[in-house]
């Protein structure tokens, strides 16, 4: 999902916590069940012995969605005049509590697909007032297989009065014994945004321009295990982007067109020993992707190429504390059009920077994060990192490296599936973000 779409649906979660908490206070329940609604995270029925201890039930039920802030709106019942009415109202609230409480349980052995739904009003400074909905599901291709982790799928939609919208589906399909995987993303979005130009020096001029970016993306990968934890596979990518409603009279991106369509075909090689993908406690993840965009399969004027590299490492350092490291690089061929350039920022890397403020052909980022469970479902993190955008390796300038650091809170929805609240800082910038699952 996009950064704004995840923030849109997640804010609804916070509102639902307040509403159901208020209902609990008026109806005098002895306690509430733990809650969650989550985009599919592959949770094995029996976690490894060295995982962090399971958190006790939390009194706040919640539901989460995609990448902008959003909340499941469930109004608390009004004070009643009679015992019968009160019983009916308590029954309604209890059904809500039970619904989210049961979503923490693995029902993939009983159901073909176990869906959880959430939705409600949303607001953020980027997207304004809106509404978002989410359906997150877990399923198993073989419900007699207790070794393979569940597959997941998420469907989401967001719309706001500012003109922002996002509709999409994404997921991971895991085959028997994790020997084959398919992951996919399909998204349609339109977002009012800004551009500062291309390159580090353009940002220093502080001359941003507004425009609306519409995007249609389809991405899919197939991976097959060839050695223990080692995978090889292919990928397909289709991307259509166009800019409109821009301010100013000069061209928005110089002599580049405002609309591009690209189709990419590529190869992926990975080593993945992580114990749990959304929130690893141990393991190593190495990934190399090489994608070619043929001229005849799009509107670009030449054959384009993109290479990406990821190296992640996770290790327990003391009780309930994980040290995580992430190194990421993205390298595009010369002449790459504006929609395909590397964009710094977002909710995964260089948190605190507006995504797209620093844009160029190539990008390298690194970050080190300490993750500590504090009490029950509550945890905290602190991180530090740096990043650089540059046109070519020969023009790489260490003096243009940008700092990044921040801290955050974690609340566990399901076992090892967290809502994260982060506040990131950078060069002359800072930003709050709310999302689901760890950043890397």
Which residue stretches match the model-derived regions?
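Short loop/turn motifs that connect adjacent beta-strands in outer-membrane beta-barrel proteins
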Residues: 104-113, 141-150, 176-181, 227-229, ...
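C-terminal outer-membrane beta-barrel translocator/porin domains of Gram-negative envelope proteins
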Residues: 265-266, 270, 275-373
């Amino acid at each position: 999902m996009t950064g704004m779409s995840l923030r849109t649906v997640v804010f609804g979660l916070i509102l639902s916590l307040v509403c159901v908490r208020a209902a609990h206070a008026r109806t005098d329940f002895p306690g509430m069940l733990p809650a969650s609604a989550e985009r599919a995270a592959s949770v094995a029925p029996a976690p490894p012995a060295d995982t962090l201890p399971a958190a006790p039930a939390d009194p706040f039920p919640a539901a989460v969605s995609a990448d902008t802030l959003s909340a499941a709106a469930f109004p608390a019942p009004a004070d009643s005049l009679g015992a019968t009415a009160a019983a009916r109202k308590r029954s309604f609230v209890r059904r809500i509590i039970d619904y989210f409480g049961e979503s923490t349980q693995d029902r993939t052995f009983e159901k073909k697909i176990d869906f959880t739904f959430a939705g409600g009003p949303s607001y953020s400074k980027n997207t304004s007032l809106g509404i978002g909905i989410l359906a997150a599901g877990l399923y198993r291709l073989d419900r007699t297989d207790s070794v393979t982790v569940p597959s997941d799928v998420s469907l989401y939609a967001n719309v706001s009065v500012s003109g922002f919208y996002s509709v999409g589906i994404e997921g991971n399909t895991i085959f028997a014994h994790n020997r084959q995987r398919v992951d996919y993303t399909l998204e349609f979005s339109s977002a009012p945004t800004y551009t500062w130009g291309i390159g580090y020096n353009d940002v220093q001029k502080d001359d941003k321009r507004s425009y609306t970016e519409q995007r249609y993306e389809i991405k899919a990968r197939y991976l097959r295990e060839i050695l223990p934890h080692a995978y090889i596979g292919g990928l397909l990518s289709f991307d259509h982007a166009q800019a409109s409603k821009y301010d100013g009279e000069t061209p928005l991106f110089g002599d580049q067109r405002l609309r591009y369509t690209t189709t990419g075909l590529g190869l992926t090689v990975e080593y993945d020993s992580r114990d749990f993908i959304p929130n690893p406690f141990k393991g190593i993840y190495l990934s190399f992707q090489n994608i070619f965009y043929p001229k005849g399969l799009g509107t670009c004027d030449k054959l384009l190429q993109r290479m990406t590299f990821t190296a992640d490492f996770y290790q327990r350092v003391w009780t309930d504390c994980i040290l995580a490291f992430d190194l990421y690089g993205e390298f595009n061929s010369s002449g790459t059009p504006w929609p395909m350039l590397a964009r710094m920022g977002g909710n995964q890397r260089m948190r605190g920077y507006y995504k797209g403020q620093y844009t160029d052909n190539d990008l390298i980022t690194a970050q080190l994060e300490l993750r500590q469970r504090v009490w029950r479902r509550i945890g905290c993190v602190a991180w530090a990192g740096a990043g650089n955008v540059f046109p070519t390796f020969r023009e790489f300038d260490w003096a243009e490296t940008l700092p990044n650091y921040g801290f955050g809170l974690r609340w566990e929805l399901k076992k090892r599936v967290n809502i994260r609240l982060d506040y990131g800082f950078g060069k002359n910038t800072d930003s709050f973000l709310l999302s689901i699952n760890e950043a890397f």
